[in-house]
Each structure stands twice: as structure tokens, then as C-alpha cells.
Amino acid sequence: MKKNMKLNFMLMSGVLLFGMYSCTPGAQDYSSYVNPFIGTGGHGHTYPGAVVPNGMIQPSPDTRIYQWDACSGYYYADSTMNGFSHTHLNGTGCGDYGDVLLMPTVGKQDYHAMGEESQQMAYASAFSHDNEVAQPGYYSVFLDRYQVKAELTATKRAAIHRYTCLLYTSDAADE
């Protein structure tokens, strides 16, 4: 009888453990809850670019150059993109770094000096938030002026840009 009780106990324990194991929820991807656009308007001074934890580089779009709302380089209310730079400070409240901008262009560009009142570079492009995607480690936007899809991602120490030109004309090649 004692042997029977031990066997029943072991059997019930095994069934219980198996039942508990099969009820364990699968791993969740909590990054789907992240909205990188939070704080990019008002005075949040954040940016939506591609960032990894403890990364040395933060590739992100730059829509403004001067003034208070341009502290992080990006301001959600803007509809013009000046380019993409690699170092940004989140929530600073003061200007940062003075980055070199990268901007994919098509065709001949006219460069001219601009005054401090302008928030747009000569080669800036319009964009729509409808064609903008930001998620942890990835940023993408469609540049209307050049018909280019720009994609940015980051590792701990490097950024990767991919530019896809959707419109190719012989005029662009000739200029």
C-alpha cells in the first residue's frame, strides 16, 4: 500500500508539473509597445531615430537646426527633413553636438548660404508622417522631393543607412 501511495504521488506530481509547464505563456516582444514619437513634440526634446541600449550612436532625422524646439534635431510638427545625423541627446533642453548631416539627393543641387531664421537647408525635402516609421532600432521615412525611401538602423557602435531611389529619370542622371 505504501508503494502504491508513492507511485500515485509521483504520477500526480508529474501530471501537475506537466500541466504547469504547458500553461506557461510564451515570451512576449515588449518592444511592440514602444512609441519612439513620444516626446518629439512640445518640449520633450526627444528624437525617433534608431537606437539600441547603451549604443554609442543614435542615427535620427533632423528637421530643425536652430532654436529651442530643435534641441534633439527633430520636431514632430515639422514637415521638412534636412537630413540624418548620428549623435543626438534625448531630452536635453539645449543644443547638442553640431552633427554632420547626411542627405540622399537626386539630380543637381543648388547650395546657398542661409540665415539663422531659416530652419531648412537648401537640399531639404518634404515628408509626411504617414510615410514615417519608427520602432526600437529602426527608422524609415519617404523623402518626397527626391522620391527616396531612407532607412536607418543601429548597432552599439555603428549606424547603417539604406536609401532606395524609387524614381529614376534621365534628367537626374544628366544633371
What are these regions (language model features)?
Residues 171-175:
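A short, hydrophobic C-terminal helix/tail in secreted or cell-surface proteins
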Residues 2-10:
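Bacterial N-terminal signal peptides that target proteins for export
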Residues 26-170:
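Accessory carbohydrate-recognition regions in carbohydrate-active enzymes
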Residues 11-19:
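Bacterial N-terminal signal peptides
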